[in-house]
């Protein structure tokens, strides 16, 4: 169906531009963007994510380094590593793979990263810049940035007159997503687990972004005809049709039910996921340009 938004295809276009801009930086200024990824412990899902991020960085022509450290690592040791990377001129982006072990304070770690190198966009300074609509100067969290690019592809950059509903209020997706939609002149509602009549709220949306981590919660009768649906949820459910103990990935939206009704919809997998990694590359490239006081590439 031609209303399915192909995240892989859009991400590939972005990566092609990142490669071209990286080549310009290297040829014109002798600068190679550098990213450091830190993973604490050996969680299999985290290992997969980190490997894919590192491979994509190398594909873009970045200097990429992985720090894989024991789950017994103490917080002060991790803080020391971050301080070292903060002062390393070869590194323009620092990413700590979440979740962290329970004995490490996640907030303390994310705030220890220099805001100029905070390519996840989690530092309070970057959050504040986004809230203040200083988008040119902020590092924007990767998933909302990628989702917003998909929305712009469908609706253009000015969302005046459109009602947007964001289901989920996390600092990683929900809140920054709402800020980006507001900056684009949409009328925005943030809904969450405590929202009364959530189905009615969702039905009001011209643009519906879901980030709640509830498999296939959003049903066909929750969505208006012709809505744009961006499904950020990644949920693993049993797939007995594949065999005993097998699973499959689904979003927060019942995709098969809703795809005929939506004007455009992202699949899971293959929707927002590839865009998240592409925007991490964009953030690293922009951070390198900004740290060297060079013009910031446009995407």
From Swiss-Prot:
It comes from the Bacteria. GO terms for biological process: L-histidine biosynthetic process; methionine biosynthetic process; purine nucleotide biosynthetic process; tetrahydrofolate interconversion. Disulfide bonds: none annotated. One of its GO terms (cellular component) is cytosol. One of its GO terms (molecular function) is methylenetetrahydrofolate dehydrogenase (NADP+) activity. InterPro entries: Aminoacid_DH-like_N_sf (IPR046346), NAD(P)-bd_dom_sf (IPR036291), THF_DH/CycHdrlase (IPR000672), THF_DH/CycHdrlase_cat_dom (IPR020630), THF_DH/CycHdrlase_CS (IPR020867), THF_DH/CycHdrlase_NAD-bd_dom (IPR020631). Its EC number is 1.5.1.5, 3.5.4.9. NADP(+) binds at residues 168-170, 193, 234. CDD domains: NAD_bind_m-THF_DH_Cyclohyd (cd01080). Keywords: Amino-acid biosynthesis, Histidine biosynthesis, Hydrolase, Methionine biosynthesis, Multifunctional enzyme, NADP, One-carbon metabolism, Oxidoreductase, Purine biosynthesis. It catalyses: (6R)-5,10-methylene-5,6,7,8-tetrahydrofolate + NADP(+) = (6R)-5,10-methenyltetrahydrofolate + NADPH; (6R)-5,10-methenyltetrahydrofolate + H2O = (6R)-10-formyltetrahydrofolate + H(+). Pathway: One-carbon metabolism; tetrahydrofolate interconversion. The keyword Hydrolase applies. Belongs to the tetrahydrofolate dehydrogenase/cyclohydrolase family. NCBIfam families: PRK14186.1, PRK14188.1. Catalyzes the oxidation of 5,10-methylenetetrahydrofolate to 5,10-methenyltetrahydrofolate and then the hydrolysis of 5,10-methenyltetrahydrofolate to 10-formyltetrahydrofolate. Homodimer. PANTHER family: C-1-TETRAHYDROFOLATE SYNTHASE, CYTOPLASMIC, C-1-TETRAHYDROFOLATE SYNTHASE, CYTOPLASMIC-RELATED. This is Bifunctional protein FolD. It comes from Bartonella henselae (strain ATCC 49882 / DSM 28221 / CCUG 30454 / Houston 1) (Rochalimaea henselae). The lineage of its organism: Bacteria, Pseudomonadati, Pseudomonadota, Alphaproteobacteria, Hyphomicrobiales. The gene is folD.
């Amino acid at each position: 169906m031609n209303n399915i938004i192909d995240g892989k295809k859009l991400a590939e276009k972005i990566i092609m531009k990142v490669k071209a801009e990286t080549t310009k930086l290297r040829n014109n200024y002798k600068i190679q963007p550098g990213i450091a990824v830190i993973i604490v412990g050996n969680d299999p899902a985290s290992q997969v994510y980190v490997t894919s991020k590192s491979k994509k960085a190398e594909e873009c022509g970045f200097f990429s380094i992985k720090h894989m450290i024991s789950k017994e690592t103490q917080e002060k040791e991790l803080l020391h590593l971050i301080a070292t990377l903060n002062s390393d001129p070869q590194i323009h982006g620092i990413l700590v793979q979440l979740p962290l072990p329970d004995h490490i304070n996640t907030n303390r770690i994310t705030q220890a990263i220099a805001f100029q190198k905070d390519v996840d966009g989690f530092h309070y300074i970057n959050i504040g810049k986004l809230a203040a609509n200083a988008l040119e100067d902020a590092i924007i969290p990767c998933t909302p940035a990628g989702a917003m690019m998909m929305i712009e592809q469908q609706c253009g950059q000015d969302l005046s007159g459109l009602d947007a509903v964001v289901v989920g209020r996390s600092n990683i997706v929900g809140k920054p997503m709402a800020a980006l939609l507001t900056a684009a002149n949409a009328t925005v509602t943030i809904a969450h687990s405590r929202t009364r009549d959530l189905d009615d709220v969702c039905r009001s949306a011209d643009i519906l972004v879901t980030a709640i981590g509830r498999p296939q919660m959003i049903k066909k009768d929750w969505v208006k005809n012709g809505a744009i649906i961006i499904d950020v949820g990644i949920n693993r459910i049993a797939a007995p049709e594949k065999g005993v103990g097998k699973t499959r990935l689904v979003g927060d939206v019942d995709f098969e039910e809703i795809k005929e009704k939506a004007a455009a919809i992202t699949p899971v997998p293959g929707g927002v996921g590839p865009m998240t990694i592409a925007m991490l590359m964009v953030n690293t490239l922009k951070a390198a340009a900004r740290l060297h006081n060079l013009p910031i590439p446009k995407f």
